[in-house]
């Protein structure tokens, strides 16, 4: 989502540039999972470019130039929104990350071991992969071909996998139950993506019911 020029101008005017010596700290947070991904610095030019392009851009203090996150790796940070803290000297930048954020290959710059990532973060990464498959050619993967066949076929697969889960449970085969449950959840995620929804919407509904 690109910010309107007026919104960027409003943020720029509110930032205490003198206090931050021309470089405002920008904390980057995953919009879906709320996980903090990294921190960088923006000067006024980087802030404006971030708003105009919809991709997070920082000012590199070592290279002394603007750099857009993912400009070489492709792991860009797609802007969702930006806001200032109460002191007007720190930005919170909410994003949809495309790929891992850290140059080490991990989801965040505070996560040294990919195996320690939370299950929900991994699930969100899977949803990102499915979103990419949705726009890919039908011959590129099974999932892409499923999207190409439309909602009716995807819904049919969810129904079929639901039956397989029930059969595995009644047979008492726990290993098979796990496998079939994985298939069901995968196809459910595909269906949610097809309908413009995510597992986050389902989780929010569950939270709402259990307040």
Swiss-Prot record:
One of its GO terms (molecular function) is ATP binding. It comes from Vibrio vulnificus (strain CMCP6). This is Histidine biosynthesis bifunctional protein HisIE. It is an enzyme of class 3 (hydrolase). It comes from the Bacteria. GO terms for cellular component: cytoplasm. Its EC number is 3.5.4.19, 3.6.1.31. InterPro entries: His_synth_HisIE, HisE, PRib-ATP_PPHydrolase-like, PRib_AMP_CycHydrolase_dom, PRib_AMP_CycHydrolase_sf. In the N-terminal section; belongs to the PRA-CH family. In the C-terminal section; belongs to the PRA-PH family. The keyword Heme does not apply. Signal peptide: none annotated. Keywords: Amino-acid biosynthesis, ATP-binding, Cytoplasm, Histidine biosynthesis, Hydrolase, Multifunctional enzyme, Nucleotide-binding. The gene is hisI. Residues 1-122 are annotated as: Phosphoribosyl-AMP cyclohydrolase. It is found in: Cytoplasm.
